[in-house]
């Protein structure tokens, strides 16, 4: 049986070699976002999991995207959000391996982070792990 932390690390390692990581200017983490970061960071977290031979985990892969400044006004960097989301979809949409399966739990969405002039692309996925232990 796997724990939430083990699944976070598994998901982290799956994402680590992807084009998504190569395209952001920040870091990839499974222990939280660096304090005060203004970069495009990717944070992996698992919210809940079940036990049994097929364990299902609800996980979030959040990508933080700073706003752009347009004539002194802080605006959503929508073109960057679209670009990064387009890299997420093939990564998380019905991926299957011998050890686990990943699929979206809900459509990826950009959420405004109040007070810090950035948005978060929330990828809520379900990772199902085949427990052969």
Placement of each model-derived feature along the sequence:
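Charged, amphipathic alpha-helical segments and their flanking helix caps
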Residues: 1-24, 45-133
């Amino acid at each position: 049986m796997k724990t939430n932390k083990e699944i976070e690390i598994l998901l982290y390692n799956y994402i680590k070699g992807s084009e998504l990581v190569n395209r952001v200017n920040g870091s990839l983490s499974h222990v939280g976002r660096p304090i005060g970061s203004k970069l495009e960071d990717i944070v992996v977290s698992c919210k809940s999991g079940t036990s049994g031979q097929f364990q299902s985990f609800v996980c979030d892969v959040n990508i933080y995207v700073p706003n752009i400044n347009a004539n002194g006004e802080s605006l959503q960097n929508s073109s960057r959000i679209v670009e990064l989301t387009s890299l997420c979809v093939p990564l998380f949409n019905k991926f299957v391996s011998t050890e686990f399966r990943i699929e979206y739990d809900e459509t990826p969405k950009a959420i405004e982070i109040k007070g810090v002039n950035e948005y978060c692309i929330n990828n809520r996925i379900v990772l199902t792990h085949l427990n052969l232990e």
